[in-house]
């Protein structure tokens, strides 16, 4: 299943991989900003940050975020991660939308993802399949995170050097 969503990185060594599934229920009653439960990958905590009605956009927004509490990440912490977030119909996983990225997470840059994951009108009012099925069904959806932590022997992999 991993290979379906994440391209191989032949020049990099994988440290760990994890799959986390979050069953999102009662979507329309959710707060503006929601976190999933925390899960582990590469010896570090991770979670999904979710804006059901968008993060300053007209799209549902999903991000992968380190799960350390404020100020609790180890000093100098960084983790290089390739990930794919897949939003699927809770009753039929063949109906889905996906977005992938790779990012160097750091204590002060703890989330990365997709402000424009999927348009809200496509979620709530437009059928997602020719048969008329919706991605959001029974006010629910499933979000699956495929997470691959890669080793960074150079200490600068995917570093943006802005700071």
Q: What is each PLM-predicted segment?
A:
Residues 1-163:
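Protein/peptide-recognition domains central to ubiquitin and immune signaling
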């Amino acid at each position: 299943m991993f290979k379906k969503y994440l391209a191989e990185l032949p020049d990099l060594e994988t440290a760990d991989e994890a799959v986390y599934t979050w069953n999102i229920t009662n979507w329309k009653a959710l707060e503006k900003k929601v976190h999933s439960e925390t899960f582990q990958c590469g010896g570090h905590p991770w979670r999904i940050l979710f804006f059901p009605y968008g993060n300053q956009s007209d799209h549902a927004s999903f991000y992968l975020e380190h799960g350390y509490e404020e100020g609790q990440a180890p000093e100098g912490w960084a983790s290089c991660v390739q990930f794919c977030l897949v939003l699927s119909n809770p009753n039929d996983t063949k109906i889905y939308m996906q977005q992938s990225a790779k990012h160097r997470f750091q204590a002060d840059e703890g989330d990365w993802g997709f402000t424009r994951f999927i348009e809200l009108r496509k979620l709530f009012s437009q059928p997602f399949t020719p048969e008329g099925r919706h991605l959001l069904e029974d006010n629910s959806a499933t979000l699956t995170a495929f997470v691959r932590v890669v080793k960074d022997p150079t200490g600068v992999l995917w570093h943006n050097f802005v700071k």
